[in-house]
């Protein structure tokens, strides 16, 4: 079975910025890939937090140029929240895939076994994250959109304009 693909339709400062299409490594990290896929479709309904288990309408709250763009906190919106389809947090599945360059999709965490819904897209090779963050996919279309998101980031991670996932799901 081919690996699933998902998309984000992005806005930057309220303006359409284009589509990011990602392939999820369900063959290597099935639990992590399924969590992200279901959070893109919103098919699991409402989570324990009382918020929909859905990336739609959530923001990239932390964008650091020449490093990464982080999002997926749909409960608090500031990097303190998020929730997986399995409950609050889940274990690191494996560290088979590496942070090899731009477009790598990886789980943000607060230490071992703390995966929820927050993720990041690398804009450079970030090999120091290997063995600490679970790589579970890659951008296959729209890396230019990721680069545009990177342009509104800062050293602190604060964005100069809101970066929002206006819509998301699986391409038909």
Curated annotation (Swiss-Prot):
Q: Where is the PPIase cyclophilin-type domain?
A: 7-170
Q: How is its activity regulated?
A: Binds cyclosporin A (CsA). CsA mediates some of its effects via an inhibitory action on PPIase.
- EC class, as a word, reads isomerase
EC number(s) on file: 5.2.1.8
Which locations, inside or outside the cell, does it occupy?
Cytoplasm
The answer to whether UniProt assigns keyword Isomerase to this entry is: yes
**Coiled-coil intervals, chain numbering:** none
Sorted keywords for this record are: Chaperone, Cytoplasm, Isomerase, Rotamase
Catalytic activity annotation: [protein]-peptidylproline (omega=180) = [protein]-peptidylproline (omega=0)
Q: Please give the start and end residues of each transmembrane region.
A: none
Instruction: Report the superkingdom from the record.
Output: Eukaryota
Expression is induced as follows: Not induced by infection with virulent or avirulent P.syringae. Not induced by phenylmethylsulfonyl fluoride (PMSF) and yeast elicitator (YE).
InterPro entries (alphabetical): Cyclophilin-like_dom_sf (IPR029000), Cyclophilin-type_PPIase (IPR024936), Cyclophilin-type_PPIase_CS (IPR020892), Cyclophilin-type_PPIase_dom (IPR002130)
Tell me one Pfam family matched here: Pro_isomerase
Tell me the Gene Ontology biological-process terms attached to this UniProt entry: protein folding
| Gene Ontology terms for molecular function | cyclosporin A binding; peptidyl-prolyl cis-trans isomerase activity
Q: Which GO cellular component terms are attached?
A: cytoplasm
Q: Which cysteines are joined by disulfide bonds?
A: none
Q: Which family does it belong to?
A: Belongs to the cyclophilin-type PPIase family.
Q: What does this protein do?
A: PPIases accelerate the folding of proteins. It catalyzes the cis-trans isomerization of proline imidic peptide bonds in oligopeptides.
Annotated protein name in UniProt: Peptidyl-prolyl cis-trans isomerase 1
What organism does this protein naturally occur in?
Answer: Glycine max
Which gene holds the coding sequence for this protein? Cyp1
């Amino acid at each position: 079975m081919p690996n699933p693909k998902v998309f984000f339709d992005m806005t930057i400062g309220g303006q359409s910025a284009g589509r990011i299409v990602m392939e999820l490594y369900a063959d290597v990290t099935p639990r992590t890939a399924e969590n992200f896929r279901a959070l893109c479709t919103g098919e699991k309904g409402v989570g324990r937090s009382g918020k929909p288990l859905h990336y739609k309408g959530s923001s990239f709250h932390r964008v650091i140029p020449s490093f990464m763009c982080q999002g997926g906190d749909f409960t608090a919106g500031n990097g303190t929240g998020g929730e997986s389809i399995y409950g609050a947090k889940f274990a690191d599945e494996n560290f088979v895939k590496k942070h090899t360059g731009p477009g790598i999709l990886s789980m943000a965490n607060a230490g071992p076994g703390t995966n929820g819904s927050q993720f990041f897209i690398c804009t450079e090779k970030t090999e120091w994250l290997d063995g600490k963050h679970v790589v579970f996919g890659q951008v296959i279309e729209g890396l230019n959109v990721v680069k545009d998101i990177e342009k509104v980031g800062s050293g602190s991670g604060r964005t100069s304009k809101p970066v929002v996932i206006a819509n998301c799901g699986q391409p038909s």
